[in-house]
Amino acid sequence: MKFSALLPVFFLLLAVIDYCQAFAFLAAIPSILSALGKRDVKTQKYVDIKRRDLDLDDMLSKLFED
């Protein structure tokens, strides 16, 4: 597919996105999607604890291997 064939699709997509910005719930979709991928303080705390527990379990298993 040629790049020149995709150009009208790109402009149509821009027009649709611009039109959707008028609706509050559609305008919130990009921010919601970006927030899904971010770590917040609450979840990061549990990730760190889990990682420390795995490191501790690994260390204890190496100590008691003998």
Swiss-Prot record:
In this UniProt entry, the residues modified to Leucine amide are 36
Task: Enumerate the subcellular locations listed in this protein's record, separating them with semicolons.
Answer: Secreted
Query: What transmembrane ranges does the database entry give?
Result: none
- Report if keyword Transport is assigned: no
> Where is this protein primarily located?
secreted
Write the record's keywords in alphabetical order, separated by commas. Amidation, Antimicrobial, Cleavage on pair of basic residues, Secreted, Signal
- Claim: Secreted is one of the keywords in the record: yes
What tissue specificity does the UniProt entry give?
Expressed by the venom gland.
Q: Which GO terms describe its cellular component?
A: extracellular region
Q: Note the pro-peptide positions.
A: 37-66
**What residue range is the signal peptide?**
1-22
Q: What does this protein do?
A: Probable antimicrobial peptide. Has no inhibitory activity against herpes simplex virus type 1 (HSV-1).
Q: Which family does it belong to?
A: Belongs to the non-disulfide-bridged peptide (NDBP) superfamily. Short antimicrobial peptide (group 4) family.
The name on file for this protein is Antimicrobial peptide Eval967
